[in-house]
Every structure is written in C-alpha cells, then in structure tokens.
C-alpha cells in the first residue's frame, strides 16, 4: 500500500498550498472535479464559516502542471446515488476534460466524499476508464 498526500476539489486555497509544497520540494496529488471549475471563481461551500472558492478553469493548468492530477468525478456527487450510466458519465467525462486541460493521461481516481465504501460496488467503471491508482478512503 502507498500513502499519498492528496488535496481535493480545485479551490483557491490551493494557491498558497502549492507555494508551500514547492518551497519544501514536496509532492502531492490534486483530485479535481473540472465541472466545478467554471469561467469565474465562485463560492462552492463553507468550512468553519470560511468560504470555499473554486478556481477558474483557466487557472488549473498553470497552478497544477507540476503536480499529479487525479480524477475526482465531474461534479462531486454521491456516486452511490447514481445509476451505473451516470457514474460512468461523471468519471469518463471528467477524465477526458482533465486530459484535455493538462495534455497528459490522468492515471488516478479519488472517490468523492472520500470513500469507495459508499458505493454498492468498488468497480463501477467499464473500460476504457482504467486507472493506475485509486484512493478508496481518506483520513481527515
């Protein structure tokens, strides 16, 4: 088993995080939901009364180009609430769009909400959606 340092969702706080990672020559994987990154930055949630703001899609390449990028689904849904076809759409479309933005193969997948255990099956992906690694559980 391999332990990865992963950060999710493509948010503005990643700008400072990446400055720190680069300063210490650290690696990380960023799990992105490109459907959440539009033409403008927007508030996508709150954590402890602090706004969580998504990055603009046009910011993604320059920010994450020196790091691993993984698929985190298109819109970050509870995959267990979707049909097989909807899960496939969420995963395949996000992978394709990420590969277009980053000009490279996306080899990893991280389940939204941090756990494959939310799914009825841990293998929801028909070919050709194949990954070198999958994050199936996160620790906060």
Task: Please name every model-derived segment.
Residues 1-10, 44-50, 76-83, 112-114:
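The substrate-binding groove and active-site-proximal loops of carbohydrate-active enzymes
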Residues 2-4, 27-29, 66-70, 106-108, ...:
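Structural preference for beta-strand elements that scaffold enzyme active sites
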Residues 8, 21, 30, 72, ...:
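Conserved, mostly hydrophobic/aromatic
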Residues 13-16, 76-140:
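Catalytic domains of cell-wall/extracellular-matrix polysaccharide-remodeling enzymes
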Residues 15-36:
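A short alpha/beta connector and helix-capping loop motif
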Residues 18-25, 49-71, 98-100, 129-130:
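Acidic (Asp/Glu)-rich catalytic clusters
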Residues 21, 39-43, 82:
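Short, charged, surface-exposed secondary-structure boundary motifs
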Residues 39-51, 116-125:
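Short, flexible/disordered intra-domain loops and linkers
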């Amino acid at each position: 088993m391999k332990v990865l340092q992963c950060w999710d969702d493509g948010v503005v706080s990643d700008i400072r995080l990446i400055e720190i990672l680069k300063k210490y020559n650290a690696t990380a994987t960023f799990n992105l939901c490109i459907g959440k990154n539009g033409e403008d930055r927007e508030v996508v949630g709150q954590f402890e009364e602090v706004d969580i703001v998504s990055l603009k899609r046009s910011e993604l390449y320059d920010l994450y180009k020196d790091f691993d990028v993984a698929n985190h689904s298109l819109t970050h849904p509870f995959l267990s609430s979707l049909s097989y076809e909807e899960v496939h759409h969420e995963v395949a479309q996000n992978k394709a769009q990420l590969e277009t933005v980053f000009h490279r193969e996306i080899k990893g997948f991280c389940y939204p909400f941090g756990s494959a255990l939310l799914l009825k099956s841990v293998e929801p992906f028909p070919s050709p959606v194949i990954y070198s690694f999958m994050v199936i559980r996160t620790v906060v």
